Amino acid sequence: MAITGGMQSSDMVLLLWITVICACCSFVDSSRSHRQLITSPSTTGVCRYGIKAECCYGWKRNRKGQCEAVCEQGCKHGECVGPNKCKCFPGFTGKNCNQDLNECGLKPRPCEHRCMNTHGSYKCYCLNGYMLMPDGSCSNSRTCAMANCQYGCEQVKGDIRCLCPSGGLQLGPDGRTCIDIDECAVGKASCPINRRCVNTFGSYYCKCQIGYELKYVNGRYDCIDINECLLNTHKCSINADCLNTQGSFKCRCKHGFKGNGQECSAVFNKPVKESPKFGGSVKDAIKKLLAHKNSLNRYNDIKNVIPETFITPPPKNRLQPFDYEDGVYIGGNDNDEEEGEIEEEEEEELDEEDEENVIEEEKLLRGDVFARQVKRAAVLSSQPISNTDPVLKSDEVLVDCRFDQGTCEWKQDSKDDFDWKHAERHNGNGYYMSVPASTSQKKGIGRLKLQLTKIYYKYCLMFIYRLAGERVGKLRVYIDENINPIWEETKNRDEGWRTAKIEIQESSTRKSSSITFEAVRGKDEAGIMALDNVFLSSGPCSDD
């Protein structure tokens, strides 16, 4: 009985151990089933998390609800078959299937005689004297040996024809050698709109357009614009802003500068919207010149007209000076009109005989050349026309130059450092002379010189000028070859146009023969010096 009882105890212990081991095994199985991969063909990439089925790590659910592998770098010439795992198409290799496979370098060689690698494939051709068979092998052919083809030949219905190993090659004029076909030029290439065709021998490939680079974006390779402005690879001026565009960039000069963007030069801080107007004596002198021009125009109109003997009554109201046959009148005075009528009746017969000669001696004035003679006294009182050259009793306008037709009688000095430039106003209304900001050297000198043909004891020189810039330089006026200027101006607070009036007094021992404008360039590269409306007359300047 004791033995029997001991045996029963050992059996119980053994049974207990078996139960514990089974429980542990079932626990391990249950823990493994918490994340179990489902290997069904229809559920590739699906893992079970407990009772829930989701895509495994490295897989994602597509629009159809199926789990598909994710390749972060993409598969250019292949397909993604697993997490970051590509299966390349024939003819390509590499982790991302973006490299051409050189089949001709494989062992064993795919061709019996000669192999030519192409993009994504290869071509076989035979040596001279052999024929390419349908299975890719080369067969000896006496006819092909006689054909002397560059890349072998084939026999079609008893006719021998030389072959080219690629569709991008064609038989040359001799019928034996192969020449390249430029698919890009003949339009056989097929490239996306944002890529350009690059021809190769026997083929071609598509490359991103200039200004684009190939990048992997949103699961595929595409040509993306290069931001030249961000990479600082543009060619814009330091005084211009770079604006990136698709495939290119644009340069736009900053505020205060002008140019094409690659070269920008400074402009005026205060653009001139209209031509400056003279005031005072300058305005009066110009009115006198215009009155004389009107007189000459009237003389020219009646030059070939036979004068009649009847008397034309003058108008009662004259608002500005006009030239008539016996002189210049200014309206507003009835007594002067009556006196003019009496003088006209008395002197009409004498003037008719000499009128033609007087008219021929008069010349039309131009605003950009020397004025011959302007009667200042004629504007103030009426005088009859004489048979001789008119003798001015007062001032003469020697120069009235606005630089609209060039530099008039002013000449560039050949011994200075730079020339004055002929510049157009911003509003397109006229021209002026300027010293450009980009001169070849600092403190350079540029001169404009005028030779005087008539000598007077006094001159009145009037002009407008502009000096813009912190250290733009100096503008001077010289008489003859004197070393000391009679007038000098530097930059002032008002950088707009200003009027200058200089009275030149001659001595009994010296007479002026030339007047010179001299510009001395300063250190400011963005400043400018300008000159316009130069007016020179004999006599003193008025105090108006």
Swiss-Prot record:
Residues 334-357 have a biased composition (Acidic residues). GO terms for biological process: cell adhesion; cell differentiation. Residues 333-367 form a coiled coil. Residues 1-30 form the signal peptide. Keywords: Basement membrane, Calcium, Cell adhesion, Coiled coil, Developmental protein, Differentiation, Disulfide bond, EGF-like domain, Extracellular matrix, Repeat, Secreted, Signal. GO terms for molecular function: calcium ion binding. Residues 399-543 form the MAM domain. The keyword Transmembrane does not apply. PROSITE patterns: ASX_HYDROXYL (PS00010), EGF_1 (PS00022), EGF_2 (PS01186), EGF_3 (PS50026), EGF_CA (PS01187), MAM_2 (PS50060). InterPro entries: ConA-like_dom_sf, EGF-like_Ca-bd_dom, EGF-like_dom, EGF-type_Asp/Asn_hydroxyl_site, EGF_Ca-bd_CS, Growth_fac_rcpt_cys_sf, MAM_dom, Nephronectin_domain. Residues 332-357 are annotated as: Disordered. It comes from the Eukaryota. Pfam families: EGF_CA (PF07645), MAM (PF00629). GO terms for cellular component: basement membrane; extracellular region; membrane. Residues 63-98, 100-139, 144-178, 180-218, 225-265 form the EGF-like domain. Disulfide bonds join 67-80, 71-86, 88-97, 104-115, 111-124, 126-138, 184-197, 191-206, 229-242, 236-251, 253-264. It is found in: Secreted, Extracellular space, Extracellular matrix, Basement membrane. Belongs to the nephronectin family. May play a role in organ morphogenesis. Promotes matrix assembly. This is Epidermal growth factor-like protein 6. It comes from Xenopus laevis. The lineage of its organism: Eukaryota, Metazoa, Chordata, Craniata, Vertebrata.
